[in-house]
């Protein structure tokens, strides 16, 4: 019989616990399962989301790490809807590339980047909970894949473009409804339901069973964590209610005005609950001026 342990949510752990080198194994496990190869994190790099703030209800949480091969891995957790999320993914990867090459260095110093995005909102249409994107150059007339010459260790070698270009992983947590039987499914079960099997051997999760137990937190940490969970529950309730109202209005009117009013309804509800302008802008995509007029 399984012990019903309570585990700390991943977004909280990423922001406050997994940056500790003693806990790298949890994050390494997730990346290992996704990439299909053993990954060792050498160090964490500065990232925009590693600052702790009191008002982080809608903040993204991210970690930027370097592995033993010198590659850069970005792990981002996003709790709420972003209108231009793909553009932000691209910007984050581009910034990581340019930050880690000096002016005047040869292009062979450009680092491979992996962008892992864990989303708790509806990004769009799609039936899977895991999507993988990589760059492939396909012949327009021959349909073959281009292989390029590169110089490594003073030798010319053949490489596929996707060995050089960034790779993207999108994990749509809310779309996971499977029974967890594979390592990636066990990870999704934890990300969505905070559940970890007692007998798990999945990389990262066997370490998480020991390191991410709710009962190991101090009283102060528990109070902060419980408040965070309450914020998420209220936020989800407000957003779901407002989205339902927007859908109903859209169906009734059959016009774009209905969808626009739904967004306005979300903004009004969030504003009445005391959320800041910046947070409301992130959720709804409205401008500061539009929100101020509500």
Predicted regions and their residues:
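Elongated, amphipathic alpha-helical interaction scaffolds
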Residues: 1-294
């Amino acid at each position: 019989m399984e012990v019903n342990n309570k585990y700390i949510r991943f977004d909280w752990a990423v922001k406050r616990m997994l940056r500790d080198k003693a806990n790298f194994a949890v994050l390494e496990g997730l990346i290992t399962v996704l990439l299909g190869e053993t990954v060792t994190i050498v160090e964490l790099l500065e990232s925009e989301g590693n600052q702790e703030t009191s008002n982080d209800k809608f903040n993204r949480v991210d970690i930027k790490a370097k592995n033993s091969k010198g590659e850069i891995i970005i792990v981002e957790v996003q709790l709420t809807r972003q209108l231009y999320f793909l553009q932000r993914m691209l910007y984050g990867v581009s910034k990581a590339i340019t930050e880690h090459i000096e002016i005047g260095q040869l292009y062979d110093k450009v680092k491979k980047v992996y962008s892992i995005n864990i989303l708790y909102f509806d990004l769009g249409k799609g039936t899977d909970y895991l999507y993988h994107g990589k760059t492939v150059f396909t012949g327009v007339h021959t349909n073959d894949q281009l292989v390029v010459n590169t110089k490594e260790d003073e030798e010319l070698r053949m490489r596929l473009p996707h060995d050089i270009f960034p790779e993207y992983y999108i994990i749509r947590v809310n779309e996971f409804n499977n029974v967890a039987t594979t390592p990636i499914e066990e990870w999704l079960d934890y990300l969505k339901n905070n559940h970890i099997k007692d007998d798990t051997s999945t990389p990262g999760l066997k370490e998480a069973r020991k390191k991410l137990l709710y009962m190991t937190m101090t009283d102060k940490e528990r109070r902060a964590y419980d408040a965070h969970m309450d914020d998420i529950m209220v936020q989800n309730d407000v957003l779901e209610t407002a989205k339902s109202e927007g859908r109903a209005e859209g169906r009734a009117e059959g016009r774009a005005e209905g969808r626009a009013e739904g967004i306005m309804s979300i903004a009004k509800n969030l504003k009445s609950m005391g959320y800041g302008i910046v947070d409301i802008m992130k959720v709804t995509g409205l401008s500061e001026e539009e929100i101020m007029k509500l």
